[in-house]
Structures are given as structure tokens and as C-alpha cells.
Amino acid sequence: MEPRAVADALETGEEDAVTEALRSFNREHSQSFTFDDAQQEDRKRLAKLLVSVLEQGLSPKHRVTWLQTIRILSRDRSCLDSFASRQSLHALACYADITVSEEPIPQSPDMDVLLESLKCLCNLVLSSPTAQMLAAEARLVVRLAERVGLYRKRSYPHEVQFFDLRLLFLLTALRTDVRQQLFQELHGVRLLTDALELTLGVAPKENPPVMLPAQETERAMEILKVLFNITFDSVKREVDEEDAALYRYLGTLLRHCVMVEAAGDRTEEFHGHTVNLLGNLPLKCLDVLLALELHEGSLEFMGVNMDVISALLAFLEKRLHQTHRLKECVAPVLNVLTECARMHRPARKFLKAQVLPPLRDVRTRPEVGDLLRNKLVRLMTHLDTDVKRVAAEFLFVLCSESVPRFIKYTGYGNAAGLLAARGLMAGGRPEGQYSEDEDTDTEEYREAKASINPVTGRVEEKPPNPMEGMTEEQKEHEAMKLVNMFDKLSRHRVIQPMGMSPRGHLTSLQDAMCETMEGQLSSDPDSDPD
């Protein structure tokens, strides 16, 4: 049925005709997510009529039908202004049982009405900044959090739980104040950690299920997304022992999530949300990833269970096949693996054995090939600075932050970006908690080491001599041409001669010479003033 016909029926006020018109419209547009511009004014008129009835109170008998029509029209951005009013939002929140009230949450609400109201609110909060502001002012997050806390005691349908969590996700993603309110005032990390454990259906010390069912997967992903929003900056602050215990408890659940498969071909998506949240944990809490007890069939390395680290590495390999949004795909898992390797020697040695095995092929450039090392070295020169930074940082940590070892595996040309940023162009080693790991050279590498070009990281074929057959006068002429070309480029600021400062940073040649001379003068006792 057309919006104009439905609006005409509403204006007649005949209950049966109105109900039938709404039901017909709902059936026809249940899967409509885009709308015809030609009927825009008719839809706006219908929306205003619906709002007037909504604010006065919907008939209990046909409440679901009315809410379904509101839900469909709330997908249309041209109708948002009508629905995004304080009165409309309050009415929808009342039907969803999430208005702040002294009264307890009803024991047996109408779940169909509650669900439709939640869907309407999700649509409005997603698309309307006004609705976002009004929802925050109405403190809807308080009642939502209270209901999430009741999931263990009361039985709510899957869809109600899912849209509770979806609305929480939208509010925390779009409103900083709601994010802080849930994190601090409502103790959101503890609340949602308990909800995650309930959804996964396991205790931290038990083995994870083989497959997480589809509905539990959907709810778990929403919980992970809300937790990500509210813990986004928690890693930047120190945590006390009580908070550290909570984050470690959450870490054990995330460890389960990494190891479990998700139904409906959603495993990679599920693991992606898990890894994103792992990156928000305080660094000292990541030790839970290596705390899994050894059992038959587990992957042991240096007496430590590496099942979780191996699973994260396999996830990284999958993500490296992505061709778009590479930063979002690989940066979180690379950050987690980097911190695990930096803080735990067994993890670093295991990852190095997998990613940077002893060099045998010395005739292929480090970035060429399909090995994991080759793919990561290619990322070191990616256009996205964040992508190349995290890839280089990961490999640098696997090399125990040893500059010669880093250059050996990646080539000086690929390594130059990180070394310049760290002030390590002149070599050396930054301060770090690393033991002296052995880096055993293969026979092939030892034999070719003297012939390896440090810039490209491989043995180069000896190029022909371009001056072969030239007379001395011709050579001198070509040399002067080259000098003049460089001089012209330098004078026109196309290129700038660079040098190494005493601190190991690249700087202009003039500045580098000045710093060197200043350093020499300051260290020369004869240069002191009389």
C-alpha cells in the first residue's frame, strides 16, 4: 500500500481500516531500506501522523503493528526529524522498558512490543544526531545496563538481548559521555564481562566448546564491540590490582574466543572483534594468553602452551590476504603479537621461528615471495604509515630490536623508515628487556654474507661496468655532468644532501656537520673559555 493511502486511512480514524492499512504497508515494505523520492512528502505526512498517535499512546491491541510501521519509516532519513523528538523518544523508551525509573524492570513485559521499540530506537540513534543527544540525556544506558545484568536471572529472547546490546553499542560508539558513563558509573567492564561469560557458556578454566552457535555468536560480537568502545583508552592508564584482576579475567574469556569456531561462517569476523578488544587490555594483562595449561594435542614451545599465539598468527595470515581496509584488518593483531613478543621471551622465540626462520634463500629480495616474512616486509613500504609502522615494529621486536639482525632479514632499504624514526640509522640498539638470543646463520647465508647487498637484502648479480671502453677524458666528462646535475637539483631544492647526526637521526648535511662540530667542541677541554 502506498504511504498516501495509509495516511488517508489514519486520518479517517476507523480502527479496522487503519490496522489493515498499516499491516498492508508493513508486509509490502518489510525489506525496504531505500525509498522512492517521489513519495517522500507522503512518507513525511505519514510519519507525522504516526508520531502524533505515538505521543498520545498506542492502542495495546495493535501496538506491535504501529511500531512496525514506525520502524520501517525510521529507516528513511527524510522522516527522522518527525521521530527524533523528546516526546517520541520517551514513548519508544517506555515501550522498550528502558526509561529511568524508581520502579523495577517489569517481570513479564510484552516481548514483541519491547523488541519493536528497541529496533526503532536503534534506527533513530544510528541515523539521527538529535536522537543520539536525546537518548544520552534520557540516560537510556542506565536501564539497558540494568537489564543486561538480569540476563543470568531472567530469560529474555535472543532478539531482545541482541538489540539491547546493539543499542548499547550504538550509544557508546556515537556518544563519548555515554561511553564514560557505562565505563565508570555503571561498571560496564565487569557487567559485560559477566554477560560474555554467560553467552559463551563456559567458565574460564574449562575447555572452550568446539563451535559457538549462531545466536550466541551474534550476541558475543555485540558484547565485544561494546567492551571495545568503553575500554578504548583504558590501556593508556595504569590499573590497580583489582582492575588488573578483572582485565585478566576478561583476557581468559578472550582467549576462549580466539580458540573457538563460530557458526555460520563468521569465525573470522568473531575473531576480529576479539583481537580488537585484546589490543585494549592493559599490557601487563596479556600474560593470560600464555597461561593456558598444557594438555594432550596442545602446541608446546619452551614449556609454554602456544595454542593462542599460533591461532593469532593464523588469523594474521588470513588478514594479510585482504586488499582493502588493510589498517583495520592487520594493525590490531600485529599490535597484540608485538606486545606478547616484547614481554615474553618464549612467545618471541616461537614467533621468530615461524616468521623469521634461518635465512637460506639469499638471492631473493626479502619482500618477494609468499612466505609470511615476505608479506610483512612488503607492508613495511606500504602507503599507509600506520600499516608500515606496525609491520616494521613487529619484525623489529622479533629481531630483539637488534639493528644488524633487522637489516639482515628485511634489507636496509625496507628497514630505513623504522630506523630513521627511532634514531637508529647509525646502528646500535634501543633500551629493551631482551636476553641475548642466538641468531644461528645457515651455511647458505654464511657463504653468501660478504656478497649480500645490505640495501636490498640479497646477493645481487654483478652489473656491467657502464664506463667500460671509455677513455679517461670521457670518464671525467661524465663525472662532471653528474656533479652538475646534482648541483642543479640541490640548488633548486629538488633534493637535499643528508647526513647522520650524532644521535643517529637523518638530518641535512649542514646541520649534521654543525652538530658534530658542537659535540667535538663541548668534549674538547681546550675549547673552554678563559
Swiss-Prot record:
The modification Phosphoserine is found at S435, S501, S522, S523, S527. One of its GO terms (molecular function) is guanyl-nucleotide exchange factor activity. The modification Phosphothreonine is found at T440, T442. InterPro entries: ARM-like, ARM-type_fold, Chaperone_Ric-8_A/B, Gua_nucleotide_exch_fac_Ric8. One of its GO terms (cellular component) is plasma membrane. Its main location: cytoplasm. SUPFAM superfamilies: ARM repeat. It is found in: Cytoplasm, Cell cortex; Cytoplasm. Expressed in neurons and neurites of the CA1 and CA2 subregions of the hippocampus (at protein level). In adult brain, it is expressed in the neocortex, hippocampus and cerebellum as well as in the pineal gland and ependymal layer. One of its GO terms (biological process) is G protein-coupled receptor signaling pathway. Disruption phenotype: Death during early embryonic development. Heterozygous mice exhibit impaired spatial memory and decreased anxiety. Keywords: Chaperone, Cytoplasm, Guanine-nucleotide releasing factor, Phosphoprotein. Coiled coil: none annotated. The keyword Chaperone applies. It comes from the Eukaryota. The keyword Nucleus does not apply. Interacts with GDP-bound G alpha proteins GNAI1, GNAO1 and GNAQ, and with GNA13 with lower affinity. Does not interact with G-alpha proteins when they are in complex with subunits beta and gamma. Interacts (via C-terminus) with RGS14; the interaction stimulates the dissociation of the complex between RGS14 and the active GTP-bound form of GNAI1. Interacts with NCS1; interaction is favored in the absence of Ca(2+) and myristoylation of NCS1 is not required. PANTHER family: SYNEMBRYN, SYNEMBRYN-A. Belongs to the synembryn family. Chaperone that specifically binds and folds nascent G alpha proteins prior to G protein heterotrimer formation, promoting their stability and activity: folds GNAI1, GNAO1, GNA13 and GNAQ. Does not fold G(s) G-alpha proteins GNAS nor GNAL. Also acts as a guanine nucleotide exchange factor (GEF) for G alpha proteins by stimulating exchange of bound GDP for free GTP. This is Chaperone Ric-8A. The lineage of its organism: Eukaryota, Metazoa, Chordata, Craniata, Vertebrata. The gene is Ric8a.
